[in-house]
Structures are given as structure tokens and as C-alpha cells.
Swiss-Prot record:
Protein name listed in UniProt: Endoribonuclease YbeY
Top enzyme class: hydrolase
Positions that bind Zn(2+): 114, 118, 124
Keyword Transmembrane helix part of the UniProt annotation: no
Molecular-function annotations in GO: metalloendopeptidase activity; RNA endonuclease activity; zinc ion binding
Disulfide bonds: none
EC number: 3.1.-.-
InterPro entries assigned to the protein according to its UniProt record, in alphabetical order: MetalPrtase_cat_dom_sf_prd, YbeY
NCBIfam families assigned: rRNA maturation RNase YbeY
The organism of origin for this protein: Finegoldia magna (strain ATCC 29328 / DSM 20472 / WAL 2508)
Task of the protein: Single strand-specific metallo-endoribonuclease involved in late-stage 70S ribosome quality control and in maturation of the 3' terminus of the 16S rRNA.
CC annotations in GO: cytoplasm
Cofactor: Zn(2+)
GO BP term (any one): rRNA processing
Amino acid sequence: MIIQISNRQEDFQIDDELTSDIEKSIRICLLQELNDDNYEISLSFVSESEIRKLNSDYRDKDSVTDVLSFPLDDDFAIQTNLLGDIIICCKRAIEQAKEYNHSIKREIVYLVVHSMFHLLGYDHIDESDRIIMRNKEKSALKEIGIYKDEEFK
């Protein structure tokens, strides 16, 4: 498993402990879904201005969001084992962590898991798809050791 991490923001320090938790969460998602972790993912931590621009350019939404997922074309991903890109806005993740009363590390791990399932082909546009994706997230988070309203160990 290869995870290319790029930190292009100054709102939160991406330390070794968080990096390890991120690697663990990505591996769990891959093993649960594909029974294989021989994939490459790009993960970028960005500022509000950068994620707003990406959201505007690729989704026609001129707003800050917490996370964006850019899966690669299925045929290309299968041939190369490249799944795609995850872009996280740390400032927005900090705000959400406060809102939900848990740590920023917990929020970032959740956002990584959520985004991984987008890279793996899931979505939450309609209710039935949302339920399927949410159950996948819950299963992965449980294996990681994150439960609703709790910190992970």
C-alpha cells in the first residue's frame, strides 16, 4: 500500500500518530472491500481557499467543504492499482470536530474512511445508497476502534 501525503495547509499539524491512524484506516477499508491492500492513494491536506477552488472547478460549488474525493477511472485504476485522490480541508475538519464534540484526529480519520468508500465506488446521493455507504463506514470505523461519540484508541 502506498499513500502519498501532501500537507498544503497550516491550520493543523499532521503528526506521525495521525499518519499511522490514516494508514490503518485506509488499509482496513481496502481489506474489507477488496481483500487486498496493494493500492496507491493520494491524500492532500489543504486550506479553505484551495478546497473552495477545487470544489468550484470540479463540482461547480463555490463553497468550502470538508473533503473531496476524486476516484480514477475504473479501467485505469484496475490496471495501475491507483485508486484516486482524497483532499481534506483541515480548517473545516477542526470546525466539525468542535461541532460534534470529538478530536480533530477522529474527524480526519472519519473523513478518510468516508472518502475511501467514494474512491471504492460508493455514494450517498439517494437514501438507499446513503444507507449502504454509511454501513460500510460504520463497519470500518468499528474495526479501527471508533464508535459514535467516542474517541478511538
